[in-house]
UniProtKB/Swiss-Prot annotation:
Places the protein is found: Cell inner membrane
One Pfam match: GTP_EFTU
Family recorded in the similarity comment: Belongs to the TRAFAC class translation factor GTPase superfamily. Classic translation factor GTPase family. LepA subfamily.
Keywords: Cell inner membrane, Cell membrane, GTP-binding, Hydrolase, Membrane, Nucleotide-binding, Protein biosynthesis
Name of the molecule in the record: Elongation factor 4
GO MF entries: GTP binding; GTPase activity; guanosine tetraphosphate binding; ribosome binding; translation elongation factor activity
Coiled-coil region: none
Length: 603
């Protein structure tokens, strides 16, 4: 076990994590030259295009150190984005060390800090690396100061490297061997292996990526998941070098994969502990009683409705979501019906990036045409009789009279930006009902800490943050608590009928403004009818905004010329009567753009 090192790479988006991983794989001869393509570990197209890592991947590398010994290095790739923080914490808890990669030209960014704190909390040895040293504007001294200031780890012997040119790669590998501890664990104890990641393969079912902590697992043995209690046969084992290499057994300290004929991803939950079941006398000694710490069920935070543009596509959308869920266990969905949009699904996501990626994968990999409703968050509603109910769909919110209080999710937001943009970012955060908790200067960077309602972030906070800071600000957030808030449901009515898909939940202080904005936008979109159409925004029975689309009408008195006024009145009254009858039986169709209009109303 002393010759095994498990490590991962922590970096902000675009700081060169995947390129560095490629270089390390190449240096250790993990792939032949011809198989070496850019970003070997990012296997999804969307990962390569957006330059982000979504799922954790691994590579087991053999490295001959300068002292002549051969070491087994297991590189566990981690996602860098804040939405995937649970996957990051699982990847990191499988490691003893981490390379903290910082772009020498840009310095420390928000998600680096968030993930680095996770690593330090888990007791992982962090080795700082300054990447992109080949750039003319690299400023290693400033980057070192920022690492020490913001993260608080010693950066005097940070390794300078450039993943692009290959400079400093050997120094990194030596540091992994010298500065990171070997795995801790009991090779002779009962088997305990943690699932770091799992994905679905069409030929063999679910593939689980595991880190064996104690004991050993041989091919063909019976394994048990401790969170769900289900048992399976370990049909095949192996390691990734990134290509897969079958093995007869996995020992304590190793990272490898297990294929056990599992059909659905729900059974292999990320972070769960696997142990052995052995029959016969003394078999109990092989079964662990205590699972590994840190496992938790992932809870979605952002909800939106997904509807097919054609009602006949509903079944194929369901199939697509089922297939997508095989590879993305954090996606939640359930069928829902809307009067305006027909049949569709209410989906739960980890965050906005996760929502975008799911939408994009549905459209790209499954050819779906989708309508997405405005994203909303889950509210805790305390009803008048004292029962607490979770509401994530605005149209399911009970009436004001039956409510005691509504609690909304509050998150702690960390914002990092250069000093020049502090004023603009603070103004934006205050508009979004943020409460400033802290402000700290680190060299040229400033870190602001706010408490904000998640509902304000999911609408368009990230886009606005980027625009007021010209793209320099970065953010990450974590859930804090539910807190009582004065939020109301604004319904949109057409001729007195509610349109369920257009309901929104907003803070009372913004309800007038948002209601008026939606109503005036709707007036532009809905076409004129033969009778007046009243568009109203209402809170309960209290109308807060109204616009009227005037009827198209024929000039019925054009043929009269002179003549008696009573004759004209008779014709006008007859027309009025006809319009009234029409209005009773007519219905207004809501065009597609109306639902998108809600998204575009600036808060």
């Amino acid at each position: 076990m002393n010759h095994i090192r498990n490590f991962s790479i922590i970096a902000h988006i675009d700081h060169g994590k995947s390129t560095l991983a490629d270089r390390l794989i190449q240096r250790c001869g993990g792939l032949q030259e011809r198989e070496m393509e850019a970003q070997v570990l990012d296997s999804m197209d969307i990962e390569k295009e957006r330059g982000i890592t979504i799922k954790a991947q691994t590579a087991s590398l053999k490295y001959k150190a300068q002292n002549g010994q051969i070491y087994n290095l297991n590189l566990i790739d981690t996602p860098g984005h804040v939405d995937f923080s649970y996957e990051v914490s699982r990847s990191l808890s499988a490691c003893e060390g981490a390379l903290l990669v910082v772009d020498a030209s840009q310095g420390v960014e928000a998600q680096t800090v968030a993930n680095c704190y996770t690593a330090l909390d888990l007791g992982v040895e962090v080795v700082p690396v300054l990447n992109k040293m080949d750039l003319p504007n690299a400023d290693p001294d400033n980057a070192k100061i920022e690492i020490e200031d913001v993260i608080g780890i010693d950066a005097t012997d940070a390794i300078a490297c450039s993943a692009k040119t290959g400079m400093g790669i050997d120094e990194i590998l030596e540091a992994v061997v010298a500065r990171m501890p070997p795995p801790r664990g009991n090779p002779a104890g009962a088997l305990r292996a943690m699932i770091v990641d799992s994905w679905f393969d069409t030929y063999v079912g679910v593939v689980m990526l595991v880190r064996v902590v104690d004991g050993r697992l041989a091919k063909g043995e019976r394994i048990k998941m401790m969170a769900t209690g289900t048992t399976y046969n370990a049909d095949s084992l192996g390691v990734f070098t990134p290509a897969n290499e079958p093995r007869e057994s996995l020992e304590a300290g190793e990272v490898g994969y297990i294929i056990a004929g599992i059909r659905e991803l729900q059974a292999a939950k990320v972070g769960d502990t696997i142990t052995l079941i052995k029959a016969g006398t003394g078999g109990a000694a092989f079964t662990a009683t205590e699972p590994l710490p840190g496992f938790k069920e992932i809870q979605p935070q952002v909800f939106a409705g997904l509807y097919p543009t054609e009602a006949s596509e509903y079944e194929s959308l369901r199939d697509s979501l089922e297939k997508l869920k095989l590879n993305d266990s954090s996606l939640r969905y359930q069928p829902e019906v809307s009067q305006a949009l027909g049949f569709g699904f209410r989906c739960g996501f980890l965050g906005l990036l996760h929502m975008e990626i799911v939408q994009e994968r549905l459209e790209r990999e499954f050819d779906q045409d989708l309508i997405t409703t405005a994203p909303s968050v889950e509210y805790q509603v305390v009803q008048a009789d004292g029962t607490v109910k979770m509401v994530e769909n605005p149209s399911k919110m009970p009436d004001q009279g039956r409510l005691d209080e509504v609690r909304e999710p509050i998150v702690t937001v960390h914002l990092y930006m250069p000093q020049d943009y502090v004023g603009a970012v603070m103004t934006l955060a205050n508009q979004k009902r943020g409460v400033q908790m802290n402000m700290a200067y680190h060299g040229r960077q400033v870190m602001l800490t706010y408490e904000m309602p998640l509902a304000e972030i999911v609408m368009d906070f990230f886009d606005k943050l980027k625009s007021v800071s010209r793209g320099y600000a970065s953010m990450d957030y974590e859930f804090k608590e539910y807190r009582a808030a004065d939020v109301v449901k604004v319904d949109i009515l057409l001729n007195g009928d509610k349109v369920d898909a257009l309901s929104i939940i907003v803070h009372r202080s913004q309800s007038q403004y948002r209601g008026r904005a939606v109503v005036s936008k709707m007036r532009e979109i809905i076409s004129r009818q033969m009778y007046d159409v009243a568009i109203q925004a209402a809170i309960g029975s209290n109308v807060i905004a109204r616009e009227t689309i005037k009827a198209m009408r024929k000039n019925v008195i054009a043929k009269c010329y002179g003549g008696d006024i009573s004759r004209k009145h008779k014709l006008l009254d007859k027309q009025k009567e006809g319009k009234k009858r029409m209005k009773q039986i007519g219905s207004v169709s809501v065009p597609q753009e109306a639902f998108l209009a809600i998204l575009q109303v600036d808060a």
